Amino acid sequence: MAAAARPVDVVRHFPCSSSVAASSSLLLSRSKSRLASPAAAAASSMRRRLVLGVGAAAAPAVAALAASATPAALRDCAATLLITAGAYSLVRAFDGLTARRLIEQNLSRKIVHVLSGVLFMSSWPLFSNSTEARFFAAIVPLLNCIRLLTYGLRLSTDEALVKSVTREGKPEELLRGPLYYVIVLLVSVLVFWRQSPIGIVSLSMMSGGDGFADIVGRRYGSAKLPFNENKSWIGSISMFISGFLLSALMLFYFSCLGYFTVCWDLALGKLALVALAATVVECIPVNDVVDDNISVPLATMLAAYLLFGYSSCC
């Protein structure tokens, strides 16, 4: 009986032994493949040691800098990091929506156009009252300038970014409207900052006014302007209304925080004239020569300076 059972035992145990052999051969093949690229392993190890070494060397300097930094500098650094992360997340979120075809490319581009300026302005009170605060805030548009130059000059590629912020999906388009936009953000921070209504009104007209003009004009702009077939009556009216309302809202926001004074009985009429000037400039058929992201804020800055002055809205 025992002798008869042996073949059965062998049959039962044979698959297990074969699976073990297969597993062993698989492990050996993996080991061979790993050993087959010692250069890659050495490079990876070198990169790890380099990163750890740089981190270890920089840690004391970072700790010393943090210990010697003033509370205002720490606050400004934290605000810069937070806003930079928010700006990157905003663009990436609409990248994803565009890639999944949940939103049209042109609509995505203009929503990013509107939100970028509005959210950036709204975040300015996060910075301290130090004289250096504006330079920390300027880091955010400066990084975006570098990013747009990098992809616009094809030094690197980011197809999702290109699709979400350009009209035709071409990298070189990043060097026009989007780049002009962030340059205006940079200039507004460095020249006007929170103490002047000029930069705030200019960004409101560029982001909100021009942005809503395109959104509404594309959908409902069948009646074109007689002197510019690329612009519509409804789009221009939308720019005037949205730019005026957003400018008034942002002036109210910053005046409530005490950055400047607004005499509302005079300011609203002057603000309407500024919005009208920006709308007229946006209607002029010179977009092939001067981009709207340059002409609109420049016209707004000039009109606001003539009507308001530098530091008040009275």
Swiss-Prot record:
Transit peptide region: 1-62
Pathway: Cofactor biosynthesis; tocopherol biosynthesis
Family as reported in the entry's similarity comment: Belongs to the polyprenol kinase family.
Localization in the cell: Plastid, Chloroplast membrane
UniProt name for this protein: Probable phytol kinase 1, chloroplastic
Enzyme Commission number, as recorded: 2.7.1.182
Enzyme type, top EC level: transferase
Protein's organism: Oryza sativa subsp. japonica (Rice)
